[in-house]
Amino acid sequence: MDKIIKTISESGAFRAFVLDSTETVRTAQEKHQTQASSTVALGRTLIASQILAANEKGNTKLTVKVLGSSSLGAIITVADTKGNVKGYVQNPGVDIKKTATGEVLVGPFVGNGQFLVITDYGAGNPYNSITPLISGEIGEDLAFYLTESQQTPSAVGLNVLLDEEDKVKVAGGFLVQVLPGAKKEEIARFEKRIQEMPAISTLLESDDHIEALLKAIYGDEAYKRLSEEEIRFQCDCSHERFMNALASLPSSDLQEMKEEDHGAEITCQFCQTTYNFDEKDLEELIRDKS
């Protein structure tokens, strides 16, 4: 079971979220049949969305769009405050580029572009916020977004590690944020600890990476666990939803589908589930329009 744990330092100067997103990213890889670099890029964006959604309340939905100029194309993810996230990468077949230590790089495949966050509070008029991609490695881009757009100094670490067959081995991350009222010496102490943290990939390799992340963030400093919540890859598509989408088409288009294709087949971009609509379904939609 994937989870996100929310914590706050005893002094109230900082808060931290730590995530285990292994099954989330594994499910995404299975559904989209992504290659190595596209798996890591999509996985990191899913984790980034889970972090942002954890910052929200109510029935808020967050869409993250990584709009890069390179071969991966767009990466789109949607997360809500109930722990659900879904997403896809435009070009899932982008393959591997590794460092000398075996780390999978995604920046060259993302390229230059924008990090766009759409926040929908469920009352209409979603709020859009855009910052430039500074590296294309997603974690650094999220930290820059939080610092620039939300004016909240933030440290972010997130990654997806693959096994020898390029299947998801482990995925997760953390967010640390300065809270109002933090003293300069507290900020300096935490900044030093973050700078001295082992690489996120090293922490994720630990037997209990959640505890390893918390230990790396807080050291010997006291903190409180505020909550532990389940997170998951979950798409909200349905036959009814796509039926409504077909209903928005002109009658002439529906008639053409009925006569030439004898139905319609729609595949959800977010989870690759296929929905079939027969001539009877199309006839019903045409009749409702008349």
Swiss-Prot record:
GO MF annotation terms: protein folding chaperone; unfolded protein binding
Disulfide bridge map: C235-C237, C268-C271
Keyword flag Cytoplasm: yes
Gene Ontology CC: one annotated term: cytoplasm
Key word Disulfide bond present: yes
Taxonomy, superkingdom: Bacteria
A Pfam family annotated for this UniProt entry: HSP33
UniProt keyword list: Chaperone, Cytoplasm, Disulfide bond, Redox-active center, Zinc
Post-translational modification, as annotated: Under oxidizing conditions two disulfide bonds are formed involving the reactive cysteines. Under reducing conditions zinc is bound to the reactive cysteines and the protein is inactive.
Classification via CDD domains: Hsp33
UniProt xrefs under PANTHER family: 33 KDA CHAPERONIN (PTHR30111:SF1)
NCBIfam families noted in UniProt: PRK00114.1
Function description: Redox regulated molecular chaperone. Protects both thermally unfolding and oxidatively damaged proteins from irreversible aggregation. Plays an important role in the bacterial defense system toward oxidative stress.
Family: Belongs to the HSP33 family.
Name assigned to this protein: 33 kDa chaperonin
Organism: Streptococcus pneumoniae serotype 19F (strain G54)
